[in-house]
A protein has these predicted regions:
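Transmembrane-helix signature of 12-pass secondary carriers
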Residues: 1-229
């Protein structure tokens, strides 16, 4: 493979790994997040209601937009949709760490799932068109998707680091001018909550993407079809 093919495979592998990273994040942070935001952990009627909502609503939103992912990749291009979907779920995870209420957390978890589902469709389409040879295509898809299993390990490690070192991290706060828009401030006693840092670590996949993105070409198959009308 040439350098461009390697770069595309690297981005796809990072995307697949952090798909699982973002999805498995919720079970790790749910109990402390619910306890802080609504005062009711899972196991109480109110806690169980929001427990279900935080799984059901994002999954539903991701499923709907995942179905639209094929249309978006055909309409806008594989590279553009892949890039923006990764940025969407990475930034959504980061912003979820600033949640001041349960509705804000639900919204950003939903946009995280939307980004994950659309990214998966775009990445598979891009890889399939990058390797016209069936044997190479199968290997590329298999090896890059295998990185999904690493996502679960990474998020467990990130959550462990957040729990152990949260008090040493910068305090999480919301600028005063944004507090009326976002529904209030983060109380000082909650400014070092590990669950917030775990969510914010979801920004990580955006960093290599911003470096590599200028060197990534559009799918030649899609470009030819687009040119042909």
């Amino acid at each position: 493979m040439d350098l461009v093919a390697w770069l595309i495979c690297i981005i796809a592998a990072i995307g697949f790994a952090f798909d699982i990273y973002e999805l498995l994040m919720l079970p790790l942070i749910l109990r402390p997040a619910l306890t802080e935001l609504i005062g009711s952990p899972p196991g109480t009627p109110k806690g169980d209601f929001w427990f279900g909502m935080l799984f059901y609503v994002p999954a539903f939103a991701g499923g709907i937009f995942g179905l639209l992912g094929g249309y978006l990749t055909d309409r806008l291009g594989r590279r553009r949709v892949l890039t923006w979907s990764i940025l969407l779920y990475a930034c959504s995870a980061f912003l979820a760490g600033f949640s001041t209420n349960i509705y804000m957390l639900l919204f950003f978890r939903s946009t995280t799932f939307i980004g994950v589902c659309v990214e998966f469709v775009a990445a598979v389409a891009w890889l399939a068109e990058l390797f016209p040879n069936p044997a190479q295509r199968e290997k590329a898809l298999g090896y890059t998707q295998a990185f999904s299993s690493i996502g679960g390990l990474l998020v467990a490690v990130a959550n462990g680091i957040a729990i152990d070192y949260a008090q040493h991290f910068p305090a999480i706060s919301i600028p005063e001018f944004l507090q009326p828009i976002l529904g209030g401030a983060i109380a000082p006693e909650h400014a070092h909550e590990p669950w917030r840092y775990t969510l914010m670590s979801g920004l990580i996949p955006a960093l290599p993407l911003l470096v590599i993105r200028p060197f990534l070409p559009e799918s030649p198959v899609w470009a030819e079809r687009r040119k042909a009308g």
